[in-house]
Amino acid sequence: MNSQILYEDNHIIIINKKVGQLVQGDKTGDHSLLELLKDFIKERDQKPGNVYLGLVHRIDRPTSGLVIYAKTSKALSRLTQMVKNREIKKTYWAVVPKEMIPQSQTLTHYLKKNEKNNKAIIYSHETEGAKKAILSYNIIKTLDNYILLEVDLQTGRHHQIRAQLSKIGIPIKGDLKYGAPRSNPDGGISLHARMLEFIHPVSKELIKITAPVPQNDAIWKACEM
């Protein structure tokens, strides 16, 4: 667990989540990163009582990268409000098929969550019940069969990056749910929460964190070189 902790102080802890880890418990009953962290902190710090830890924001189970947890209720309250106010800048890396697309582009669509299959339905125009979704991307590396996109989110919708990139014909590598032709060996998708930038909720210092990509994947390693 130590190697996954990229930043920690008395108020927050930032983790580099592995593919397949749940950020918090769900109906599967699988052990989550939240529970693992609580157990780790309790043992490391020799805490006699319960460890307080609150999830600030989610990333999908098949993705990897940065997740913020709050260690106090005050920090959780402030950070949750910052997420709502778009005061936490999130940058993602996505590996997609090598197709002829613009070097950079802003995408605007409308997304509605299908609760039955946990998938986003995407529309090109305003639709009742659908929420506006905006992202911008820039191609930062070209490989033999893939390209690496740096993606900045302007909104935070369910499966937003996955759905919007699929809509323009470039589903994320390994993302069978949104049209990728085959799965990744680790069962995940090649979407990585790469960078976070925000003002610390208590100290007011600027926090900038970058998460290394999964090291067990040759494509990811080539992207980071």
Which residues are covered by each model-predicted region?
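RNA pseudouridine synthases
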Residues: 1-225
